[in-house]
Amino acid sequence: MSELSVSMSAAGGLPQAPLLPEAPAKVTVRNLNFYYGEHHALKNINLTLGTNRVTAFIGPSGCGKSTLLRIFNRMYDLYPGQRATGQLMLDQTNILDGKLDLNLLRARVGMVFQKPTPFPMTIYENIAFGIRLYEKISKSEMDDRVEKALRGGALWNEVKDKLNASGLSLSGGQQQRLCIARTVAVRPEVILFDEPCSALDPISTAKVEELIQELSENYTIAIVTHNMQQAARVSDKTAFMYLGELIEFDDTSKIFTSPSDRRTQDYITGRFG
């Protein structure tokens, strides 16, 4: 989705991304349930993330959208007492398989968090660090990979003359794009974005949104956002969640113009949430 042609929806005047044909499934979710101890946080979730498509997850705080995102790369394994049941497939790989190598899973399914999290090291090493975890390559190959990753993060032209500067010296927007470049560097298949622009100014937000659209040419993307305009601008599909349930999942254009469920309509028009 490299170009964004927009029309205005009847539901709040939101700009709409163009409708694309259905894509082959990259991630398939069937009857997924998730528990924090005895608390049933997600209930019978069923959806599909299309290959090289952007799927937005919207809903009020606490509805389960960020929880769902973290199941896609098993981040919940870091916390005792949390468990998922059901089926969650990445192509032919069962993400919920207890024997799955989580390091390899997280190379295939990368994640960009709400707050930029650059490592306390140089810009170059921020990118090279992850590559070294999975590959042994020459210095010249590493230089090439670092450049490609920074270009993929739309950051190369801004940092090419200061690769030895600390990643922490960059602005907030640049730090977030560095984190995106770091994720791209290990060549994932899926990239998860959890409120990636919530801490950024409007100019930096626009750059990240444009970057997400460019990345969708090569990656399958899932993004959690509270910003309805952002969901409408960048996504092909939108999932509306409420109280741990998936209420509606459809083309973004339909969700924002003629949702099937009244709760979806009420949320996107600001009646609650």
Curated annotation (Swiss-Prot):
Domain ABC transporter: 27-268
Keywords: ATP-binding, Cell inner membrane, Cell membrane, Membrane, Nucleotide-binding, Phosphate transport, Translocase, Transport
Gene Ontology MF term list: ATP binding; ATP hydrolysis activity; ATPase-coupled phosphate ion transmembrane transporter activity
CDD domains according to UniProt: ABC_PstB_phosphate_transporter
Membrane-topology descriptor: Peripheral membrane protein
Any one Gene Ontology BP term: phosphate ion transmembrane transport
Family matches, as InterPro entries: AAA+_ATPase (IPR003593), ABC_transporter-like_ATP-bd (IPR003439), ABC_transporter-like_CS (IPR017871), P-loop_NTPase (IPR027417), PstB-like (IPR005670)
Major localization class: membrane
EC number: 7.3.2.1
Localization of this protein: Cell inner membrane
GO cellular component: plasma membrane
UniProt-annotated binding residues for ATP: G59, P60, S61, G62, C63, G64, K65, S66
Catalytic activities: phosphate(out) + ATP + H2O = ADP + 2 phosphate(in) + H(+)
Role played: Part of the ABC transporter complex PstSACB involved in phosphate import. Responsible for energy coupling to the transport system.
Family, similarity comment: Belongs to the ABC transporter superfamily. Phosphate importer (TC 3.A.1.7) family.
SUBUNIT field: The complex is composed of two ATP-binding proteins (PstB), two transmembrane proteins (PstC and PstA) and a solute-binding protein (PstS).
Stored NCBIfam families: 3a0107s01c2 (TIGR00972)
Annotated protein name in UniProt: Phosphate import ATP-binding protein PstB
Organism whose genome encodes this protein: Bradyrhizobium diazoefficiens (strain JCM 10833 / BCRC 13528 / IAM 13628 / NBRC 14792 / USDA 110)
Phylogenetic placement of the source organism: Bacteria, Pseudomonadati, Pseudomonadota, Alphaproteobacteria, Hyphomicrobiales
